[in-house]
Amino acid sequence: MKKLLTGALTLMLTASVSAQTKLWTLQECIDYAMQHNITLQRARLQLQSAKEDVSQSKAALLPSLNASTSHNLGYRPWQDSGITTVTNGTVNTKVDKTSYNGSYGLNASWTVWNGNRNRNQVKLNRLTEEQAELEIQETANSIQEKIAQLYVQILYLKEAVKVNEASLETSRKNEERGREMVEVGKMSKADLAQLSAQRSNDEYNIVSAQAQVENYKLQLKQLLEILGDEAFDVATPDAAMTTNEMALADVPALMSVYEQALATRPEIQSAEMAVKSSDVSIDIAKAGRMPTVSLQASASASTNSLANNDWSDQMKSNFNTGAGVSVSVPIFDQRQTKTNVNKARIQRESNLLALQDQQKQLYQTIENYWLDATTNQQKFRAAMATVESEQQSYDLLQEKFNVGLTNIVELMAGKDNLLVAKQNQLQSKYMTILNLQMLKFYSRPTPSSSL
């Protein structure tokens, strides 16, 4: 998904290279986050854990084999009889107070059938694995949306700083012109003080906007898991025409975006997967009513130091093998199976409601993006005309002010109106750009989880 958000924003990401601070493009921010974001890394670990569960459930279909052995020493201090042997007519009696015995065994078992519980467990774990993959995609999507929102907000505030700087430059010129007029007696010091106050207010607006830029940069750095002491800045567009054209792009149809999102968004697919998992869980619960058939086999041998024959002969003579089959038929389990089946069905209904809720939330999210894109685009069109009109009006006021044909109140009001118009234009432009990109983001296919 990391290329989707940058498709229409590509032209915004060209910037000159700074010798001191790396300028991060949107694509670079997304790529870095996909590798370093801790939440995403934890989601990948959950996928690895789910894969292990699948492997374990598959192995449960196979027989189990165990080897065992035990060795014991015994001591009988008052032993008075032992092993008697006759050698060359001589009777010898050996009394062993210490004895040793050992046993060796192999045991195998295999559950042949248990109502398909084991096979259904494999299915359930595979569905859980797929959900873990979708969780990675969902987490990645959420991170990319946040990155795009912060990135566009930084671009907006950077341009707002430039607008305020231009306003400050105008205020300084007006203040300088006011001083000249005071010197020749064409303006009172009270009017000059108003011009100075307007200049101070513009300086404050610049500081405030710059502080907001730094705040959003910090939020973006934290999202990317970049250390706080590292210099960080984002790439800015070279030309205003680029962002203007992007803000005036066609808004896609609401239902078209929603239908495509229903088919591709990982949160919807995950909710659908949860319903499928519920169906398998019901089958697993029903297996509690079925018999369990198992096969067993064993081989064992034992030795004792007090025996007359040697170890190898004992192993042969004491070697035993056996095999058998066992069948367990549930008759009454204190309603445990019925309870499990009912609870599994209740969980399925809950998952169906969760799916409906996800679909509703998805529609509401897309609807909000669509409405914001449509509304802000209309505002942007109107704001462009307003800025042009206010600029012409202010230029005329400034010309009149320079020759003493208008008062300070009208000049300041005209300047304030122009500043407000430019700020409204900026805000509506970048809000339109952001919401248009979100609509495109939601309407495009989701790639594989190998991010």
Predicted regions and their residues:
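Bacterial Sec-dependent N-terminal signal peptides
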Residues: 1-26, 447-451
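Acidic, low-complexity, intrinsically disordered peripheral segments
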Residues: 6, 75, 220, 228, ...
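Bacterial Sec-pathway N-terminal export signals of envelope proteins
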Residues: 19-66, 70, 235-276, 447-448
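Small/polar, glycine/serine/threonine/aspartate-rich low-complexity segments that form flexible
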Residues: 21, 68-110, 238-249, 283, ...
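Sec/SRP-type N-terminal targeting helices
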Residues: 41-45, 58-59, 98, 112-140, ...
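Periplasmic alpha-helical coiled-coil/stalk elements that build and connect Gram-negative outer-membrane
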Residues: 52, 142-260, 372, 376, ...
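Membrane-embedded beta-strand positions in outer-membrane beta-barrel channels/transporters
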Residues: 66, 105-107, 151, 217, ...
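A short glycine-centered flexible hinge/capping loop motif at secondary-structure junctions
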Residues: 182-186, 401-405, 442
